[in-house]
Swiss-Prot record:
GO biological process, one term: translation
Protein name: Large ribosomal subunit protein bL36
PROSITE patterns, per database record: RIBOSOMAL_L36
Domain of life: Bacteria
Listed InterPro entries: Ribosomal_bL36, Ribosomal_bL36_sp
Amino acid sequence: MKVRPSVKKMCPKCKVIRRRGILRVICDNPRHKQRQG
């Protein structure tokens, strides 16, 4: 899980979702998981 100021899709399978006001990226590739912090 990467925590960064701006989250971006890193590949076509990445999805940007909003959970409880936190932007997250979920993907099949665990390296692509991100959270906005």
